[in-house]
Amino acid sequence: MGLVVKGISFGYERNKELFKDIDFELNKSEILAILGRNGIGKTTFLKCLMGINKYNKGEIFVDGHKVSNLQEHGKTAYVAQNNKINFPYTFLDMVLMGRARDIGIFSLPSKKDKKDAMKALEQMGIAHLHNKICTQASGGQLQLMYLARALVQKPEILILDEPESFLDLKNQSEILKLIVKLAKKEKICCIINTHNPANAMKAADKVLLIGKDSNHNYGKTKEVLTEESISTYFNINAKIIDLESYGISQYTMVEI
């Protein structure tokens, strides 16, 4: 079992909903990509799942148990977009903060905590940067560090808000590959917000296209992301290209 969301609706004002009746199911090891136009409510929806914003109606179930939000579940890691760091913490310091819930307010990190933090950095391929000062790091390095901090929490559910934003194409590809690897290896339910349908095609098992009112489209990636749906939801003309003829088990899109 995994995560089930039923009928989630939200609005900042009464009788004026930003989105309504969002449903999806996500099994362990699966990745769900959430897409939609700017301002449609993708980030707000993630905040509703996390309990940062309070949804107006709907239900959330984790492994068959109803929860009011995913923070209540306790085994969910959330990586927000555009995280800014104004203090000279090292990468290791930041990843250890992911252990705060288990360490306690007045306790110091144990040897095991530090070992787990270094292991998470190693899984992200940045163990050699453990003493790197965050204010001196690149956007790609910081994104990997935040993933390590999420991973050290040993989450069952991982929520990432535009993890590939502000990265060049190579780093976008590397981040997405790591997310896929983590979801499969650690059996994590993973949700990513993205603006790019091609990135969803590359990484996601399922897609949720958020539209106005209840005009949402949810299902397997290849069934949901079609030339017609991309035109409808993004107002662009696109060509879907299957890469199997090139020996690659993947497909992508180009705008035309």
Where are the model-predicted features located?
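Conserved ABC transporter NBD signature motif
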Residues: 58-72
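Catalytic Walker B motif of ABC-type/P-loop ATPase nucleotide-binding domains
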Residues: 158-162
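Conserved ABC ATPase "signature" region
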Residues: 96, 111-129
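Conserved ABC ATPase signature
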Residues: 133-137, 141
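The feature captures the beta-strand-to-loop junction immediately N-terminal to the Walker
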Residues: 35-37
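Helix-to-loop junction immediately C-terminal to a conserved catalytic motif
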Residues: 50
